[in-house]
Structure formats: structure tokens, C-alpha cells
Amino acid sequence: MTTGFLQKIFGSRNQRLVKQYQKTVAAINALETQIEKLTDDQLRGKTDEFRQRVAAGESLDKLLPEAFAVCREASRRVLKMRHFDVQLIGGMVLHYGKIAEMRTGEGKTLVATLPVYLNALSGRGVHVVTVNDYLAQRDAEWMARLYNFLGLSVGINLSGMEHDQKQQAYAADITYGTNNEFGFDYLRDNMVYETGARVQRALNFAVVDEVDSILIDEARTPLIISGQAEDHTELYVRMNALPPLLERQIGEEKADGTGVEKPGDYTLDEKSRQVFLTESGHEKAERLLAEWGLIGEGESLYAPQNITLMHHVYAALRAHTLFHKDQHYVVQNGEVVIVDEFTGRLMAGRRWSDGLHQAVEAKEHVKIQSENQTLASITFQNYFRMYAKLAGMTGTADTEAYEFNEIYGLETVVIPTNRPPKRIDKQDQIYKTAKERYDAVIRDIRDCYERGQPVLVGTTSIENSELLSHLLKQAGLPHEVLNAKQHEREAAIVAEAGRPRAITIATNMAGRGTDIVLGGNVEKQAAFIEADESIPADEKARRIQQLHDEWESLHEQVKAAGGLHIIGTERHESRRIDNQLRGRAGRQGDPGSSRFYLSLDDPLLRIFAGDRVRAIMDRLKMPEGEAIEAGIVTRSIESAQRKVEARNFDIRKQLLEYDDVANDQRKVIYQQRNELLEAHDITETITAMRHSVIADVVRQFVPEGSIEEQWDVPELEEALRNDWQLDLAIQEMVNESSSITADEILDAVTTAADEQYEAKVALVGRESFSAFERSVMLQTVDRLWREHLAALDHLRQGIHLRGYAQKNPKQEYKREAFELFAAMLEAIKQEVTRIVMNVQIQSPEQLEEAAEQIEERSSHLENVEYQHAEFAEAGAPAAGGAAVAAATATADMVGSAMAHSGPGGEMPKVGRNDPCPCGSGKKYKHCHGKLS
């Protein structure tokens, strides 16, 4: 109450910011007359003047009014578009590293030119991030005319580009590209073997278009570069036979033994999209697997040797019960292609991780592709937080303002519209069944069609869009379907969607980024005519002129009919996605309307609010086909959406907290890697490693401060001879001197190792040997880092079970991840020293050949895939690996062992400094290694 009273007097934080920016707008407008008088060359010359002032120490903030005024004038001359005052405010919000929420049609693409131009003056590069290649190319080509006029270079960073093209794109003042490509380039840059092979510069300033889609919707899915791992194709095929033989349990058993309506073998948790075997399910699965010869008679699925089988059991169960064809994926050309649940687009080339994709392939009887090993990964949260300054723009950010601030430190500012909005948002209508809902939707569409009003119908899945299309065909209503299957025709369909009587069905936000203009998009239609080579030039000109002549009357006709009408056939779990659909209508002060039609069968209502609403309908004895249309019900649905949003926020935040652990380690490894690449000579590093490793070896047999009776000299001599190629007569030294100490023995061994090393260097020359050492070091770091990532994945999958032991899973994960990381660093020292000490080189040519082979083996990765894969939710079993973690007793062992398992999964000999396989968390030499 007090807050509301104060807001009335002082205005909200948003209003105060906008008011503050309006003062700067006045300063920009005051410069307009002066800037207008400049010639094109003088206007272009302003860029060089600004650059010199920035180089001399003037801040970009001080330069802002002049730079914005110059950019606006250049836009007026080149693009024939002058920035409105509210667009100048939007530009300022972006420059100050905030998120600008601007309604659809308010010109976000044009707004971005202001802060992009200003920040490009520093010469450190600006990245403009979009959601797909089409928008990146469209915006870059469209705005390049403006930037080039002002003397700035523009690059486009698209997937599949050649290495040289990428380097040129990043070297430009302004680089347009997709979020995925920027992230993958960062990962690839940290896998190169020469500094000249990198493409990115330091991350300076990024403007993220559709920031909610990139930083919120896609934040649960890390970018993963992976290569093929061991083949388990046969196992997926055999495991695919299991789910149909298991039955779902309805209801959950309570403490008093009640609650189960129908006993079964597994339970589904639709909210967290997880599946769990019941006790009877475990017994049945074990019996069936024993019959098929996959486990021994009477063996438990939780036995350590069956851990991987549990992984396959749960992957198959999730594939059959939680992932449905034409909703979560489609089958195209014999391949399973994921459907983005937020945009409805096909995500070709992306694969679910952890064996889930292979399980779905087995279910659909298509060719099963090999499982992948993670080579490098990063989340969008951690990638975008590396930019010195980050800003974003979208039509719908206010509902997620708290998350933007909490995770990224980005404040959201709602920018006023240029003209007052006229869209009418009608109350939701709720029906008992899906059939009644679709009948009402068809009635509404028919009414609009007869009145000449264009309609955009939003659906949440490809399946629903095709069902509605079928119903419209039966009703004799002509329409277009815009979903992932019609991706290529997307721009053409959207261009026509604002014409009178146009009916367009769109999956979620397919077509986002392209305005629906009332009366049709003349520019788009003209572009299609221009691109058609079969039409003669004079005919093209006539048709384009005809389009312009017709558009005015069509525009007025649609406005008179009420503008674009939006129909939502289902509420999404996020209010923001619903608002995005509504936002397609009423652009730039145009009329428009929207309404959602729901049924009690919809997942959101069924899971969160169905029983309550159904009880109201039953009490009111509502006849079939009658709808509830009441504010209390709409508020109830919005309350359910808020709960889901809060839960999804917690998941993303928890994911970030877990990934922050890996991120700290990633930074250390990448920093060390970069130092290695840039160093001319790493002799000091190699020497320090060798001394540390030799000390560990000697101390194992001749402990520090011990007496001669405790020494095992013959074993030390054998270890040095076999593992390090050092043939030393230590026993003779001991026999000759009764007063020799453990430290003197260590000094003697270290000196011998140094002499052997120097002899190898002398044979081939310092420069050649240093290059070889660098190759060995990089290859070892990369290989052990990959194995460490696999270890972290396995550790993460089982860590939630620590909660049952009254331990904090997050703290346990941090502790064990640190232990694994320390063990990995120790293993790097051991491995590098072993290779350098054991290498037998006779000539510089042999050395170069060995270095080339090492580099080739590491850098030439066959069958590399770039995934934006579903990441396991923190605190819940991971995708497809729910039970990898179920063996609490072996979780430590699996996590530790995986860090050092070879590519084929075989366990090598345990090193002294490796974590002990017993799971104690101690080093082997301080645990069971001491006993042996």
C-alpha cells in the first residue's frame, strides 16, 4: 500500500528512467537541424572524428547524443526511416546494458542501430545476436547499407561458413550471427592448436534480439560439441522391447499405503518429465532382462556391473512414455528430428543427450546413430555473462524481469509505444472437452472469414496445427499452416497473413521476427515477384505497381473489419509465450483483438487447475458446448502459469549453480590452454611437472623422513626403469653410504631425470623439442578434460540421491567436482611427464612427425556434432540416466573412475595420485594404495 502511494507521487522506477532518458532525447533533437545541413561526406566523416575522440579518452556516454543524432540522420538518408523519440530511448536503454521491452512492430531492428553504431566506435567489436540464420542475414544485409554509409564494416557469422570467412566476420566492426554460432565458435576457439586458428576477438558488447527466447527459453539447454563414443546400438534395440511390457501405475502410494488407483510397474511425473520404476517394476524388468540374457539369473539391476543397463532401461522408458511423435519430434527422411517446444521449429542436427535420442530412434525403428562423448560444453548463461557489456530487446520481457536481473544483472525497461495500442484482449473461454473447444474456434474463424478479418491461430504443437488444419478443410475454410514442416515457406506465409479473409495457423511463435502488416506486406510480396526469373522485367514492374495500388484499400478494409484477430487454442505454460502470440496483433497503433479457447483436457489445466474448474462446471450443470468465461477462471490459469514459471526459474537457477562449478574449471583449463598456445617456450612448466612427478614416485618407495629399514629400493629401481626409462643403481648408492638420506636419493633421481631430458633436447634442438612438448601438453589437456566432462556428467546424474543421506547435493557436487578436477590436473602432470620421458627420438624430423601425429589425432575430430541438447534438471534424475545414479554405494566410484577411463571405457591401472576406487575421496596412495 505504501509502495503504491509512493509510486503515485514519484512514479515507478521504469517511469523515472524513461523521464530521465527523455532529457537526452531533447538534446539529440536539438542537434538535428545542425546535423541535417551536413553533406553525405561530412556525415560520414563524423565517424572518424568520433573514433579519434574515443581514442583520446572521451567516454561513449558523453558521445551518445551526437552519435545518436548522426545515426538517425544517416538512417533517414539511406533507409528512408527516421528514429522516433521512443526508439531513441530504446537505443539508450541498450547502450547502458539493459533490456528494452518494445511491443511488436515498434522497430526493434532499427533501434539496435543506435547503440551498435556508438559502441562500434571503440574498435573492439559489437555482436548482434539473433535466433536464426535467416534473421541474422536479413538484418545484416538490411542494416549494412546504413553502417557502410557511416564507414563501418559489417560481418555475418553463419553456421557452415569457412574458417577464413568467420575470421573476416569477427574482424568487422559489427558482427551479426545466431546465439548458437557465437557460443560454438567460443568452444571451437578453445580447441585449436595454433593461435592463428582462433576466430573470435575478446567479447566486448552484445545486443541480443529476442532476448527472452535466447537467455530464458534456451538457458536450460547447454551448447555441446561432441564426438562418437562406444557403440551400444544392439542394446537400444533390445531394450526397446521392454517398455510395452510394463504398465503405468495410476496414483502415488502414500505413507499409509493408500493412494494407488491402479498398481503398475512405473510412475510418471509429467511436471518434471521423469519416469520412475516401482518395486514391482524393478522385479519385472530384472526378470525380463534375465530371460533375454542381459543380466545374470537373480542379479540386481543396481549391481555395479549393471549400471549402464539401468541407463538404457530409463532411456527406453522416457522415449516411450514422455516423448511423443509430432509433438516433441518428427521423423523425416529416416531420422528423428527434435521440435523446439518454444518455437515449433525443427532443430535439424540437434540430438538429445544421454542416450535418449538413440532410444527414440529405436522406438521409431529408424537407423540408430552412435552415442556421443562431450568434447566441450557451455551454457548460454555462462557464455553471455563473459561479455564486458550485454543488452537485449524483445516484445515480452517484463514477466521475466526478476530472472534477467537475478541471473544476468540486467534491468528491464518497458519502452512506451509510439502510438497508443488499440488491441482488445477478450476473456478466455473454457470448454469441458477439446472437441467443444475446436468447434468454438471454427465458429470464430468462420465469423472473421465472412467479415473479411484476417485470423492468426496459435497452436502449441505440430500435431494440433495439423488437426486444426484438417477441421478447417472439413469446414471448407481456405488457410495456410505455418509450422516446422513448412519452414521454407515461412516468410511468404507471414507476408500474406494480414490480407482480408486470410487464415493462418502457426505453431507457437513460428514466424517470429517478421511483422504481419494489415492488408499484406507489400515489400515482401514485391521481393517474391522480383526473385521470380520466369517473369519479364516490364511485367514485374506492372505487378509491383498493382500491389502498391491495391494495398491502401486492402489496409483500410482490414482495419474496418477490426484488424488482425488472434486465436490461441491452448495456454502455454509461460505467460510470456501467450503474450508473444497476442503481440502479433495491434502493431503501431493498428486495431486488433485476441482470445484464448481452452479445454479441461489441456496439459496446463489438467495438471494444475483442472479439478477446480471441472467442479465449477459440474456445479453449474453446464450443457455441452457452453463455455465458462469469467475473470476468476482466467486468474486461476494465470496463477498456474506463475507457478510453472517459478518452477522453471528454479530449474534454470539450479542448473546455473551446478554449471558454475564446471565453468570455474573451464576457465582455468581454457586459460592454461591459451597460455600454452601463446608461450614460446614451456621448458619451465615441463621441468616443474617432472620434478613433482619424480618426487611422488620416489616418496612412494622412500618416504620423506623415513629410515633405511622402511625403504623399498628394488621396487623403486624397477619403477624408474619400467615407467621412466631411468636405469639407476640406487641400491649401490645406499650400500656405499650408510648415512644417505631420503632427500639425497630424491636429489639423485631428479638430477638423473634432468640429465636424460637435456640429452634429448640436445639431440634435436631446443626449438623443435619445445614444439613437441606443446603438442603433447595440449593433446593431454584436451583428452583428460573430455574425460573429466564425462565424469562430471555421471556425478551430476546421481548427486540428488545424496539428499537421502541428509547431505546437501549441491555442496557434495562442488566438493566431489573439485576432487575430480584436482585428480585431473595431477593426471595431466603424470601423463605429460611420462610421454616426454619415454619418447625415443633420433632426429628433428622424427620429432616433427610425432608432434604432427599428436596434433592430427586431437584436432581432426571425425563425426563431430554440435548439439543444443536437453540438460538434466538439477535435483532430478538426468535425461535417460535416472538410475545411473541409483546405486548410492557406487556413485563415488563411478564418478572417480570415469575421470580416468579410456575411450573404450576400460579401467586403466590406478595411479598413486588418482582418487581411490573405494569411493573414500582420498588419493589412492593415502588409502588402499598404502595398504598394498
Swiss-Prot record:
EC annotation? 7.4.2.8
Q: What is its main location?
A: membrane
Q: Name one Pfam family in it.
A: SecA_PP_bind
Which reactions are catalysed by this chain? Answer: ATP + H2O + cellular proteinSide 1 = ADP + phosphate + cellular proteinSide 2
Domain of life, per UniProt, equals Bacteria
Matching entries from SMART domains are given as: SecA_DEAD, SecA_PP_bind
Subcellular location, in the record's words? Answer: Cell inner membrane; Cytoplasm
**SUPFAM superfamilies attached here?**
Helical scaffold and wing domains of SecA, P-loop containing nucleoside triphosphate hydrolases, Pre-protein crosslinking domain of SecA
- Tell me the organism: Burkholderia multivorans (strain ATCC 17616 / 249)
Sorted UniProt keywords: ATP-binding, Cell inner membrane, Cell membrane, Cytoplasm, Membrane, Metal-binding, Nucleotide-binding, Protein transport, Translocase, Translocation, Transport, Zinc
**What quaternary arrangement does the UniProt entry report?**
Monomer and homodimer. Part of the essential Sec protein translocation apparatus which comprises SecA, SecYEG and auxiliary proteins SecDF-YajC and YidC.
Locate the coiled-coil region(s) and give their ranges: none
* Functional summary from the UniProt entry: Part of the Sec protein translocase complex. Interacts with the SecYEG preprotein conducting channel. Has a central role in coupling the hydrolysis of ATP to the transfer of proteins into and across the cell membrane, serving both as a receptor for the preprotein-SecB complex and as an ATP-driven molecular motor driving the stepwise translocation of polypeptide chains across the membrane.
> What's the record's note on cofactor binding?
May bind 1 zinc ion per subunit.
Q: Which GO terms describe its biological process?
A: intracellular protein transmembrane transport; protein import; protein targeting; protein transport by the Sec complex
GO CC list: cell envelope Sec protein transport complex; cytosol; plasma membrane
Binding-site residues for ATP, renumbered to this chain? 87, 105-109, 515
Which cofactor does the UniProt annotation name?
Zn(2+)
Q: Which PROSITE patterns match?
A: SECA, SECA_MOTOR_DEAD
Tell me which family the UniProt entry assigns to this protein. Answer: Belongs to the SecA family.
Q: How does it sit in the membrane?
A: Peripheral membrane protein
Name the gene that codes for it.
Answer: secA
Protein name per Swiss-Prot or TrEMBL = Protein translocase subunit SecA
Task: Provide any one GO MF term from the record.
Answer: protein-exporting ATPase activity
